Amino acid sequence: MKSAKTKDHAKMKAAEEKAIHSTGADSKSLDEVNGSVRVPKDASFWRTLIAYTGPGALVAVGYMDPGNWITSIAGGSQYKYALLSVILLSSLIAMLLQAMAARLGIVTGKDLAQLTRERTSKGMGIFLWIITELAIMATDVAEIIGSGIALKLLFGFPLIVGILITTADVLILLLLMKLGFRKIEAIVATLVAVILFVFLYEVIISQPNIPEMLKGYVPTSRIVSNRSMLFLALGIVGATVMPHNLYLGSSISQTRQVDRSDEKEVAKAVKFTTIDSNIQLSVAFVVNSLLLILGAALFFGTKGDLGRFVDLYNALGDSKVVGSIASPLLSMLFAIALLSSGQSSTITGTLSGQIIMEGFIRLKMPLWAQRLLTRLISVTPVLAFAIYYHGNEAKIEDLLTMSQVFLSIALPFAMIPLVMFTSNRALMGNFTNRVWVKWTAWIVTVILIILNIYLILQTVGLVK
């Protein structure tokens, strides 16, 4: 009798564990918006493209967040237009990887975090979650610092107050989610447009040398032979592909309603999502190019430190640095673009945090609590630094530089599973990587890992 009860108890416990595991594994990525956007049937090419337009903008934000600004402008101020070719190469790599991430999400109905967790042990899943959570924290550091400094430059808020204000952004995101995912896409696209037009205007009035600028997109051997130039080039490449964007792309590609039993419909979704992604990443490419061109046109050959946001803000208003075009308007527009970049990145960073938390550890909690937890995890180190250094911008921006190391460490843990999963015919069926795509992806992955290891070793002083 006792034995029978024990067996029954064991069966019930096993069934309960199975149910819990199944619930976590089978839950949809970003469940509240998954499949929430309707796509018109048998519509024209342009109408269909409009329906699929949006997720690419959220992904593209990560390629022009405040963390990339200093590197791009420094590249132009030190080596004029020569590193434009590196930005072009980085953008092509981003297009390849983001297309793979979107295809993975559409075909499998699961995001990269969910698939990685399902195909690893519990211990490995927790380890990967910690690594990826650090990457999210590192990404958010740049967004919070950028927004906080922009608020100080525009409104005179103490930096600590600006950081606290950015923490409250999560409440705005909760409201936007209730209005629908298309509203979030529209707001992010608007912020991206602000960044684009601000720097387009500033580049136009800076009057760059067009022939010399176009020549910069052709790779030169000088990038490899010049050690300091190579280091900056590696910084541009290494900071371009960020791990959270691969998780984000694999999730938000599922916001459109797709019948996965219909292979033609899946193929259409993959096609239009990829087009949207490539268009938006082209915008990010233009923005990063404009940043470098601005650095080259205004700051090449000038003396002084331009390695911080405040330095750049002041320089744009100083006629001794940028000449007759210097004005408070240029400085103000720079701060507005910085705030737009920080705010748009905040939205995507918070979404990425939710995707990773749900996918890796299958943690289910009220939406407001989950987003607030994600935000607090990211803002804590920045706020601690700000309080410890009494709001000193220079010290706090050093934290931004340190955060890039975490991104470098986390990158392989996102890229390798992505290439493996999208090359797995049992998982992807007819949508598996073509041979040339697979080998290109592996070569790019290995090169980026080597470059990032090199950057890490240089950062910690093991390589000079």
From Swiss-Prot:
- Cite the residue spans of the region called Disordered: 1-28
GO BP terms: iron ion transmembrane transport
What keywords are annotated for this sequence in UniProt? Answer: Cell membrane, Ion transport, Membrane, Symport, Transmembrane, Transmembrane helix, Transport
Indicate where this protein resides in the cell: Cell membrane
**Annotated transmembrane regions:** 50-70, 82-102, 125-145, 157-177, 186-206, 229-249, 281-301, 321-341, 376-396, 399-419, 443-463
Q: Provide a GO CC annotation, any one.
A: plasma membrane
Q: Name one GO molecular function term.
A: metal ion binding
Report biased composition (Basic and acidic residues) as residue ranges: 1-20
Keyword Cell membrane included in the entry's annotation: yes
Origin superkingdom: Bacteria
Q: How does it sit in the membrane?
A: Multi-pass membrane protein
Q: Which NCBIfam families match?
A: nramp, Nramp_1, PRK00701.1
**UniProt function note:** H(+)-stimulated, divalent metal cation uptake system.
Homology family: Belongs to the NRAMP family.
Please give the PANTHER family that the UniProt record associates with this protein: NATURAL RESISTANCE-ASSOCIATED MACROPHAGE PROTEIN 2, SOLUTE CARRIER PROTEIN FAMILY 11 MEMBER
What's the name of the protein? Answer: Divalent metal cation transporter MntH
Species name for this entry?
Lactiplantibacillus plantarum (strain ATCC BAA-793 / NCIMB 8826 / WCFS1)
Please name the gene that encodes this protein. mntH
